[in-house]
Amino acid sequence: MRVLAAMSGGVDSSVAAARMVDAGHDVVGVHLALSTAPGTLRTGSRGCCSKEDASDARRVADVLGIPFYVWDFAEKFQADVIDEFVSAYARGETPNPCVTCNQKIKFSALSAKAVALGFDAVATGHYARLSGGRLRRAVDKDKDQSYVLAVLSAEQLRHAAFPIGDTPKPQIREEAARRGLAVAEKPDSHDICFIPSGNTRAFLGERIGVRRGAVVNADGTVLAEHDGVHGFTIGQRKGLGIAGPGPDGRPRYVTAIDADTATVRVGEAADLDVREMLGRAVVFTSGTAPSGPFECAVQVRAHGETADAVAELVGDELVVRLRAPLRGVAPGQTLALYRHDPDGDEVLGSATIAGTSR
């Protein structure tokens, strides 16, 4: 099998590439250049997509004895990931750019180019498993990345390979060291790769500008002014611009964002509870939507807990009714669906949260 190994320069993708070589596949390594301007992607060894990371990936490819290339996907990354990230926050939503990158870049643009060049699969260092064509959680639940892959279609998964999903992260590092890979102890990336400073509010402010509005309580009383809804997300407690807790002494949280009126509403923790979610851009990883309501477990954050629910496709929207309230759910987040069984490992699909109700 001809395999294109996506190599970020980190330990996970490096071991993934090595395992594909060990399996006897015809492997070619590729690193994606995603920066459109100097300084837009972090430098150093903590992230992906920097020049240092490209050099690390090349050195690993040399050790493995495989061809290696750097492909320029900067313009598409800017349009499909960065610009959409900014637009979503301007709409008062809370997106996950890693989800978008997987859906639009790694398993769409990259995969399409790979197939056009005669490759059978794209191998990545994601912590997830494929079994019988079905996407499943990784063995290492702490590192599991099935959530950010739940947006992939059956066709996208058909050309994907996740060689390290059956191994805990500590063993991956040990394996890299045994193989003599210099990235064995390279730190993991935790922040958004295109926000080197880690200051998301400042990054968004530079691109959206000032759009002043009001912070109000549940009855509409104005408590403060703000410079833009992009500085807030559902469940946020700090940086609200209001003095201390509410009159009852309880902390206040962002409970709703109206981008049209630039209004941010705050309330108590209990006001964050939701019992129903509406999803758009629905994807079922099997390629077939269940008929009628179905039991499932839902996850709304990359490493969040799952919650039992009943979901149903109504037209082109997904209606999800929770068995118990879920707190702090924001429009724009990805809603991942898992099979409701003792293991809870199989990914059924996903949707983008369009709205919630109590």
UniProtKB/Swiss-Prot annotation:
Amino-acid positions noted as binding ATP in the UniProt annotation, renumbered to this chain: 6-13, 32, 125
Gene3D superfamilies attached to this UniProt entry: Adenine nucleotide alpha hydrolases-like domains, HUPs, Translation factors
Record has Cytoplasm as a keyword: yes
Enzyme active site: 101, 193
Residues the record marks as site: Interaction with tRNA: 126, 333
Pfam families: tRNA_Me_trans (PF03054), tRNA_Me_trans_C (PF20258), tRNA_Me_trans_M (PF20259)
GO cellular-component term (any): cytoplasm
Recorded GO MF terms: ATP binding; tRNA binding; tRNA-uridine 2-sulfurtransferase activity
Main location: cytoplasm
Enzyme class, broadest EC rank: transferase
Cell location: Cytoplasm
Key words, A-Z: ATP-binding, Cytoplasm, Disulfide bond, Nucleotide-binding, RNA-binding, Transferase, tRNA processing, tRNA-binding
Chain intervals for the UniProt region annotation (Interaction with tRNA): 143-145
Superkingdom: Bacteria
Catalysed reaction equations from the record: S-sulfanyl-L-cysteinyl-[protein] + uridine(34) in tRNA + AH2 + ATP = 2-thiouridine(34) in tRNA + L-cysteinyl-[protein] + A + AMP + diphosphate + H(+)
InterPro entries assigned to the protein according to its UniProt record, in alphabetical order: MnmA-like, MnmA-like_C, MnmA-like_central, MnmA-like_central_sf, Rossmann-like_a/b/a_fold
Disulfide cysteine pairs (residue numbers): 101-193
Keyword RNA-binding set for record: yes
Alphabetical GO biological process terms: tRNA wobble position uridine thiolation
UniProt EC number: 2.8.1.13
Described purpose of this protein according to its UniProt entry: Catalyzes the 2-thiolation of uridine at the wobble position (U34) of tRNA, leading to the formation of s(2)U34.
Family, similarity comment: Belongs to the MnmA/TRMU family.
Protein name, entry field: tRNA-specific 2-thiouridylase MnmA
